[in-house]
Amino acid sequence: MRLFRFLFKLCFLLLVLVGFAYLFLAIFYFGSLNPFELAQPMDVFNRFFSKEALDNISSNNGATATAQTSSLLQLLEGSSNGLDNRFPTEKSAFYAIPGYVDFLKNAKLPGFVEQFTPYLTKYVIPLGMAFVSGLIGTLIVNFFLNKITRSIKRRKRNMKKQEQEEYYDDSRSRRKRN
């Protein structure tokens, strides 16, 4: 029974982690706090993992292309919406951070890291931040769940103790009771 409860709680917390990570990406990386303008789950998924998004990196010489080269190649190719899907949208909270997008586009990184820059800007930074925010949200939810379950257990324990005290608090002797 304990194993089942543990697995259920683990699955629930994993769903909470995914939910918080999605909210992080939908709000901060894609734009608006307005619930009607939130990115839909498939939009978030397609932005990172669709065939077009994956082809975009592989067509730009994969890991050998720097972020700057990739964005220039994409501009030359004239993508349909003119948006480099490795960077936050203009209305997002990340775009408002001074120097964040410039750092991603013109990253001054050591040579061995520079060859992975397209993957760093497209996957590692946003998905890593989403995972960390999801983890923080999950820890907060887990903390409150533990508080609630402890208070319920404490209340049950106190009720049981009170029932036992009432049972033995009778004026009759124990022999007559049995």
UniProtKB/Swiss-Prot annotation:
It is found in: Cell membrane. Keywords: Cell membrane, Membrane, Transmembrane, Transmembrane helix. Its main location: membrane. The chain crosses the membrane at residues 10-30, 124-144. Signal peptide: none annotated. Residues 160-172 have a biased composition (Basic and acidic residues). This is Uncharacterized protein MG319. It comes from Mycoplasma genitalium (strain ATCC 33530 / DSM 19775 / NCTC 10195 / G37). GO terms for cellular component: plasma membrane. It comes from the Bacteria. Residues 155-178 are annotated as: Disordered. It is a multi-pass membrane protein.
